[in-house]
Amino acid sequence: MGPEESIRIQSMLGSTIAMAFDECPPALSERDYIEPSVERTTRWLLRCMEELKRLRSLPDTLNKEQLLFGINQGGILGDIRIRHAEEISALDLDGYAVGGLAVGESHEEMYRILDLVLPHLPREKPSYLMGV
């Protein structure tokens, strides 16, 4: 499965919110794994945006008002998390999720990452803490 198929499936379900296709690296992954993973997630987000735009133009799309949420990733590496939050926030999505937490890191690490990331996501848009 890829980003386009993920968005098509969510569209066929008629869901109110579609979550962008992302990669959730294992909690304690090293920087040399997380950096390309986050870059891939951003590329996939752009592809999700294009596919949703295409689907909205089709006459038989169930929910032409479907919202798209981008997912912040970056493991427990604060600098990558902040950079990724800023990158996806610049795309003016319908909402934003923080993913890749509560997957093996300590509660303290999870809260530390949330404290770092949330100020870099738009306050006027919905936000969602995935999997918690």
Language-model-derived ranges and their functions:
Residues 1-61:
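Non-catalytic, usually N-terminal nucleic-acid engagement modules in DNA/RNA processing proteins
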Residues 39-42, 51, 55-59, 63-132:
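Glycine-rich phosphate/ribose-binding loops and adjacent secondary-structure elements
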